[in-house]
Amino acid sequence: MPLEDAQNVTAARKELNKLVQERDENRLRPVGLSPLFQDYAQVYLDRLSTSGKKSDTVVTERTHVNRWSKAVGHLRIAKLRPHHITGHLHGLRKAQKSARTCNLSLTVLRNILKSARIDGHLKTSPAEGLEWFKTEKKAHRLYSPDEIDRLCKAALARRYVEGRLAKAGEKGARLKNGVQFVDYLRFLQYCGAREQEALRVRVADVDMERGHVMIGAEGDSKNREARAVDLNSQLRQLLEDMAKRRAPDSQWLFPSPQRGEKDEAAKTFRESLKLAREAAELPDFGFHDLRRFFASRAVMSGIDFLCVSRWLGHKDGGILLGKSYAHLANEHRKTQAARLIFSPVILQTDKASNS
């Protein structure tokens, strides 16, 4: 085993003593050349495709692995140092990437290095001890029913030309998938499903007789468990209306408009959302805001946290709901505050009322 830092006899003895200590502690460094990072990254990607992780997770990890390969792919994996890692992460920040994106990138790198350590290419990870980027916890805005209606109305308006808003004097047209897009918005609004969960719902997952829709019936929800969302009156009406116009050749509740002969679910409605929210002047509106809307309205309706958390797919009995989703509208808080009574009151009994 080479004595890497030995420039003289004293340094050689010091390095030798260090190696003896590492041997005694069973943490000797691997002998021989480690693979280039870019080569090992490909090994990791090959394993990732058969890891059982959800497709969305695989796509995200692949993006970050490719970024790391471009940044440090020329280095042998055992030569990767903390300054290489922090240099790339700070480069992402300079490129206006969010702190969350940088933290996700670091998580993916740690996954790669953990795999390399298991394979014997590393004894310790150079990413150990690196600090996470601090993320700002912003208060989420609660959109009103009128604002959601405005978004849906904008999605069906004749205001679009070649993937953008029509300019003054231009003749606009509707979004090609406008009706389906609005159905999707309403579905999220009335059942609280996550963006990707809703896209994977099949027609067979809707049980009108039993009065529920299954989210993640194939184990493809966020927590990999199926859950039943009971039909409220608006969700039932929406699903009945959708059934009248659904594509007879597709098993999906939201089939892809470009599926051709292959039956595929729609992959995303994000481009439609960008256009509709611009037209509705709701620039920060996101699909997850509809999940927050559902949770908040359910809580304001007096439904207990445990029931709502089950509809949302939480497994903590409502703790996260209380922290993250119970955003009560201003008028509701004021109404509840008006009901507070601090002075003594005389309650009328049934006997007194009948006399």
Report residues per predicted region.
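Short basic/aromatic active-site micro-motif
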Residues: 80, 179-182, 283-301
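Short, polar N-cap/turn motifs at the start of nucleic acid-interacting alpha helices
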Residues: 205-212, 284, 303-324, 334, ...
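C-terminal secondary-structure termini that scaffold catalytic or DNA-interacting sites
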Residues: 153-174, 210, 235, 241-248, ...
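C-terminal catalytic core of Y-nucleophile DNA break-rejoin enzymes
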Residues: 220-241, 250-274, 286
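Basic, Lys/Arg- and aromatic-enriched nucleic-acid-binding interface segment
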Residues: 102-105, 118, 122-123, 128-195, ...
